[in-house]
Amino acid sequence: MLPRFLWRPVLCSYRALGSPSRSLTVSYRNLSCLALLHKGAFAAPTSRSLFCAERPISTGCTSLQVKDKRVSVQSTSDGAPPQNASHKVKEAGRDFTYFIVVLIGIGVTGGLFYVVFEELFSSSSPSKIYGEALEKCRSHPEVIGAFGEPIKGYGETTRRGRRQHVSHMEFVKDGIKCMRLKFYIEGSEPRKQGTVHIEVKENPASGKYEFQYIFVEIDTYPRRTIIIEDNR
C-alpha cells in the first residue's frame, strides 16, 4: 500500500489526460514511478540515516584523534624536557659546585680529625705530656703523703669556677724545641693544693719530647717543693 500523500498526484495526472488508455499508461507509469519512489522513500531514509549515523562516527573518530593528540602532547610535557646546550652547561656547573663543596667538607673534617689526634695521641701534644706528668705525680710517695689519695689534676680556673685546659708555652732553645707546662693537683687532704711545673725538650733523634724536670710546689703551709724528676 502506498501512503495517502502519494495518491493525489496519480489522480491529478489521470484527470488531466484525455485518453483512458493514455491515462492508464500514465497511471501505470506514475504508479511504477511511485512504486520506485515508494521503495526509495523507505530506502533513502535508511541510507540517509546511515549517512547521518556515519557523521557522528566520523566526528567521534576525529574527537578521538584530537584526544589522542592531546594525550601525546600531555605526555611530552610531563616527561623530561629536551635538554639543550645551555641546560647541560648549567647542570655541569651545578654538579661541579656540589663537588667543590663536598671536597671542602672532606678537607675540614680531615683537618678536625688531625687536630684531635695531635691533641690527644701525639707524644708532642700538651695533653699527652700533661697525662704522663700527672701519672708520675700520682705514683710518687712524697706527693701521696702530702696530698693523700686519690690525686686529681686540672688546669687554670676561671672566675666562674670553670677549669680550662693546661697552660703551656712553646719556645726554642739552642735550636731545639722546648715546652713548659703548669697545672694543679689536689688530693683527699683538706685545703691542700699544689702547683706542678714541667719542662720538656725534643729529642732530635726520635722527635719525641723528654722531661727535663717535674716538681711540685705545695701552696699551703708549710710550703715546700717536691722534686719528682730532674734531668737538667
Swiss-Prot record:
One of its GO terms (biological process) is protein import into mitochondrial matrix. Coiled coil: none annotated. The keyword Cytoplasm does not apply. It holds the Pfam family TIM21. Keywords: Membrane, Mitochondrion, Protein transport, Transit peptide, Translocation, Transmembrane, Transmembrane helix, Transport. It is a single-pass membrane protein. It is found in: Mitochondrion membrane. It comes from the Eukaryota. Gene3D superfamilies: Mitochondrial import inner membrane translocase subunit Tim21. The keyword Mitochondrion applies. One of its GO terms (cellular component) is TIM23 mitochondrial import inner membrane translocase complex. The chain crosses the membrane at residues 96-116. Residues 1-31 form a transit peptide. May participate in the translocation of transit peptide-containing proteins across the mitochondrial inner membrane. Belongs to the TIM21 family. This is Mitochondrial import inner membrane translocase subunit Tim21.
